Amino acid sequence: MSMVEEAILVNGKKIVDAQRNYFNTGVTKSYDFRLKQLKLLKAAVEKHEKQIVDALYADLRKPALEAYATEHTITLADLDLAISNLSSWMKPERVPTPLFFMPGKSRIHSEPYGVTLTIAPWNYPFKNLIAPVIGALCAGNTMVLKPSELAPATSKAITDMVSEFFEPQYMTVVEGGVKETQELLDQEWDFIMFTGGTEIGRIIYQAAAKNLTPVALELGGKSPCIVDSDVNLEVAAKRICWGKFTNTGQICIAPDYIYVQKDIKAKFIELVKKNITEFFGADPKQSPDFGRIISNRHFNRIKNLIDGDVIVGGQTDESQKYIAPTVIDNVTPESKVMQEEIFGPIMPIMEYNTIDEVIGHINAGSKPLALYIFSNSSSFSDKIVTETSSGAVLINDVLVHAGHPHLPFGGVGNSGMGAYNGRISFDTYSHRKGVLTRSFMFDVKQRYAPATEKNTNFLKFAIRKLIG
């Protein structure tokens, strides 16, 4: 082992040990402490507003409107919700007590896991790190934050913000790349949250399994979008274009491919072309509202997916990491663009005759993180919801469910496990501990040895009648 590797290893252990020692003092568990830290985090996000928004532009050329709506202001809304509801979230939950356990009372206590690690992606490098951390803080944990090295300006902004407002034994940021992340994974954690790709998610899961560490994994996949013939097509096309090309398509829940009922496909394509021009002008490369691809590696991967009947866009410029909003028609399940998650500004369009063929195609693949349906027919939507599996379903819109504070945001199968958002984030970073308090009254003698046939029959009867 080199001296550099040894230094990283010692540093990582030192961070975790310091946080575990701090957690073991019990100071993080009180309501007053947690509320104070939430208010500090809110003050930090407010104070560093300009640095955060500027960093998002530097890393992704993310427009200010998008940066506020999807990263900065939405995080402040998450903090306001947590501050208002922390007291109720922390209260023990009363649950029914069956007659067999009476007299007694039953509660579920939420207790912090302890030392937590939250690893964020580069596509929403601020929101997808701080939003889960709000849950970790509310639950009473200590926190190590690992921002993405592919968004270095945002990583620095988060480091500056956290180091100014928090002590490292409570909350700290570890910057760096693969080496630093692997070194963190070699430590013993009480909980790990990861947002990113499925392959890296498997590595995180394997590392956590060594210590039986619980995890939440928010991954990705090819999120389908289905457009019924019974629909407000103008609104549907506008919302789909917005969701597909926001953040240059670099969104884990972006509508990956579009299934359009064959009778309306031509009209849908006409509206898509119109919307792209309205959003980004005749030359999206010059638009301040259209971003860039995060890295040359991702640029080349996405560029290689542009194949087939390109009817809009297709232009690329590696020097700027620019890929135009691109629409590909007459796509089939065998097309190159359908073999992996796109994570870029390419919209494949497929047509269908019956909804059963669409459901069959979706169910033949991995379970997606999101599934989108555009239809005025509740029976059409209900059939898809019932007969497919996905992390979430959004009907007649795209993306916005991710910001809903009362709905779980997370995946299933290859798209992930666990969830966050609002109270759900608090629950994700908490161990729900059952607590049963019994009375000394009515001590049933039949439970004790020596066992007799009469006692056994009594207990069999009591268990069936008084528990079930």
Task: State each model region's role.
Residues 155-158, 184, 204, 268, ...:
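Hydrophobic packing residues within well-ordered alpha-helices of enzyme cores
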Residues 2, 6, 199-332, 355-356, ...:
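ALDH superfamily catalytic-core signature
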Residues 27, 42-45, 49, 60, ...:
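Structural signal for hydrophobic packing residues in well-ordered secondary-structure cores
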Residues 1-107:
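N-terminal Rossmann-like NAD(P)+-binding subdomain of aldehyde/semialdehyde dehydrogenases
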Residues 99-235:
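Rossmann-like NAD(P) dinucleotide-binding subdomain of oxidoreductase/dehydrogenase enzymes
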Residues 12, 31, 49, 233, ...:
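Residues at or immediately preceding the N-termini of alpha-helices
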Residues 34, 79, 140, 171, ...:
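Residue-level signal for inorganic ion chemistry
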Residues 2-3, 21, 30, 226, ...:
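Conserved C-terminal structural/oligomerization subdomain of aldehyde/semialdehyde dehydrogenase
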